[in-house]
C-alpha cells in the first residue's frame, strides 16, 4: 500500500528513486464508517481516522500490524533548498584522500533551487516488536528498537530506507535523501531530510521472505550472479604487474588450491593517473593476453575502478569538455544519462574489451567527509558532515542515491555491450533497487579484530533484511 501526503494542492505523481513504475492494482475496496474510512486489500485493512488522518494497519482478521500516532502523525516542514553555483567567488582546494586527490569546495555561491519538505512520520511500535534493516551500520546492533539510526552514506555505512518488522510487515521510504530512524524516550518516528512530499510503502507479509518479495515487487528482482562469483576470490593490496597476477594463478593451480577469481586492486593505471580507465602499459603490456591466460585456467579477473578521475587523465578531460562532472569536482555525474554512457564508453574501450570479467567499484558514495576527521566523529556529527559536504555537489533529495546510479552505469553498459557475461559489481555503496544491477556490497575499510567480526555479523544480517541479497 502506497501512502503519500503533501500540504500542496496536488501530488507530484513522481515514482521514487529505485522504485519501478507502478502497476494498477485491482481487488481493493473502500468502506466509509462514522469516524473512519477503511481500505481493504486481500491481506490488509487500513483504518484512516477522518479527523486526524492517522492510520492503523491491520491484517484482514483484525490483528494489528502497526499504528501511527493518534494526533499529528505526519509532519511536513517546508524549507528552501539551494544549489551550488560555480563562479569567480568559488574557493576550491585539492585534498589528498584514500581515494586519490579530490577537489573540495570550501566556499561557493548558492542560489535557490526549489521548495522541499523535512518529513516526519510518527509511529507506535508494539512492546515486543523487533525491527531490522535500514542498510548497514557499523555499531553491531541487530534489533534497532530503542536506538537512533542515521541513514547517510559513508565508508562504513550503507543507507537503505527499508525497515522490516518481526510483526510481519515492512516500510519502504520513497526518498533519495538522507533520513533518520528514532525510537527513544523522545519519540518514535521516521524522518527524511528533503522531499517534495511524504511518500512511503507499507508491505504486509506473513514471513520475512514475503516482505522481501514485496520489496522486490516494487524495486526489482535480484540479478543472478555467475556461478564463479559464489566461489573463492583472491585479493591482496596489491598485485602490481601482469606477470605477478599470472604467477599467482599458476601457483594456486599447481598446489591444487581452489581459485575462481583474482582481483587487481587500485593502480592499474599509469602513475599519477588516478581513476584513468586503462592499463599502465609498462606493467600490463598485454592485458588481453593476461585475461586469456587466466580464463584458460578457469580463473576470472576483477578490476577496481573509481567514479573520480585525476585532472591529469584523458578520461577527466573528456568529461570536463562535455560538462558531465559534478560541480567543481573530478567525479562524474552518474545522475546524467549522457555521463553514464560516457563513463561506460571509457570502461569499454580501456578495460572491458581486454577481457575483464567483474568490477570493484570503489568510493561509490562518493563523498566520505569522515576521512578528513582526525578523531572519529559521533553518528550525529557524521550525518551532519555528509549532509553539508555532499549537499555542495548533489541535490538534497538525491543525496543518498549516487551509488545506485553508478551501479546502473556498469550494469546497463555491460549488458548492452555483451550478454555473454553476467554483471558482477563489488561496490562499497548502493541503494533501494540496487539488487537488480548485479551488486555485491562490502562493508568498507573495517579493522581486523574479533570485535569487528562480531559487529559485522549484525551488520550483514540487517543489510540482507534491507532487500539486497549480496
Question: What would you call each of these model-derived segments?
Answer:
Residues 197-205, 234, 395, 441-446:
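Acidic/glycine-enriched edge-of-secondary-structure segments
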Amino acid at each position: 500500500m502506497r501512502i503519500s501526503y503533501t500540504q500542496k494542492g496536488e501530488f507530484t505523481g513522481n515514482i521514487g528513486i529505485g522504485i519501478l513504475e507502478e502497476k494498477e492494482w485491482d481487488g481493493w475496496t473502500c468502506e466509509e464508517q462514522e469516524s473512519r474510512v477503511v481500505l481493504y486489500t486481500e491481506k490488509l485493512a487500513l483504518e484512516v481516522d477522518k479527523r486526524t488522518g492517522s492510520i492503523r494497519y491491520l491484517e484482514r482478521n483484525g490483528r494489528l500490524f502497526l499504528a501511527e500516532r493518534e494526533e499529528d502523525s505526519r509532519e511536513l516542514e517546508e524549507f528552501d533548498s539551494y544549489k551550488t553555483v560555480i563562479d569567480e567567488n568559488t574557493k576550491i582546494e585539492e585534498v589528498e584522500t584514500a581515494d586519490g586527490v579530490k577537489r573540495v569546495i570550501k566556499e561557493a555561491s548558492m542560489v535557490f533551487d526549489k521548495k522541499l519538505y523535512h518529513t516526519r512520520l510518527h509511529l507506535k511500535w508494539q512492546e515486543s516488536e523487533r525491527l531490522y534493516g535500514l542498510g548497514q551500520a557499523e555499531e553491531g546492533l541487530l534489533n534497532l528498537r530503542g536506538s537512533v539510526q542515521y541513514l547517510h552514506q559513508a565508508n562504513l555505512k550503507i543507507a537503505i530506507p527499508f525497515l522490516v518488522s518481526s510483526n510481519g510487515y515492512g516500510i519502504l521510504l520513497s526518498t533519495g535523501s538522507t533520513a533518520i530512524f528514532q525510537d527513544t524516550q523522545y519519540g518514535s518516528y521516521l524522518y527524511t531530510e528533503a522531499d517534495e512530499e511524504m511518500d512511503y510503502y507499507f508491505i504486509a507479509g506473513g514471513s520475512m521472505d514475503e516482505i522481501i518479495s514485496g520489496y522486490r515487487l516494487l524495486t526489482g528482482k535480484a540479478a543472478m550472479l555467475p556461478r564463479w562469483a559464489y566461489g573463492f576470490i583472491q585479493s591482496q593490496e596489491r598485485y602490481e604487474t601482469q606477470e605477478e597476477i599470472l604467477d599467482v594463478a599458476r601457483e594456486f593451480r599447481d598446489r591444487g588450491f581452489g581459485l575462481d577469481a583474482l582481483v587487481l586492486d587500485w593502480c592499474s593505471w599509469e602513475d599519477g593517473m588516478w581513476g584513468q580507465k586503462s592499463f599502465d602499459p609498462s606493467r600490463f603490456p598485454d592485458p588481453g593476453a593476461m585475461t586469456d591466460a587466466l580464463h584458460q585456467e578457469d580463473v576470472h579477473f576483477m578490476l577496481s575502478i573509481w567514479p573520480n578521475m585525476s585532472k591529469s587523465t584523458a578520461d577527466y578531460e573528456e568529461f570536463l569538455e562535455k560538462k558531465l562532472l559534478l560541480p567543481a569536482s573530478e567525479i562524474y555525474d552518474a545522475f546524467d544519462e549522457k555521463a553514464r554512457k560516457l563513463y561506460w564508453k571509457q570502461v569499454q574501450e580501456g578495460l572491458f574489451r581486454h577481457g575483464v570479467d567483474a568490477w570493484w567499484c570503489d568510493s561509490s558514495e562518493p563523498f566520505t567527509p569522515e576521512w578528513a576527521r582526525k578523531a572519529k566523529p559521533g553518528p550525529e556529527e557524521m550525518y551532519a558532515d555528509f549532509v553539508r559536504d555532499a549537499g555542495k555537489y548533489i541535490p538534497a533529495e538525491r543525496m543518498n542515491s549516487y551509488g545506485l546510479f553508478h551501479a546502473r552505469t556498469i550494469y546497463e553498459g555491460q549488458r548492452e555491450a555483451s550478454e555473454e557475461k553476467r554483471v558482477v559489481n563489488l561496490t562499497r555503496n548502493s541503494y533501494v533497487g540496487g539488487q537488480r544491477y548485479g551488486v555485491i556490497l562490502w562493508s568498507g575499510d573495517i579493522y581486523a579484530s574479533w570485535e569487528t567480526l562480531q559487529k559485522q555479523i549484525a551488520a550483514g544480517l540487517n543489510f540482507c533484511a534491507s532487500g539486497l541479497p549480496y
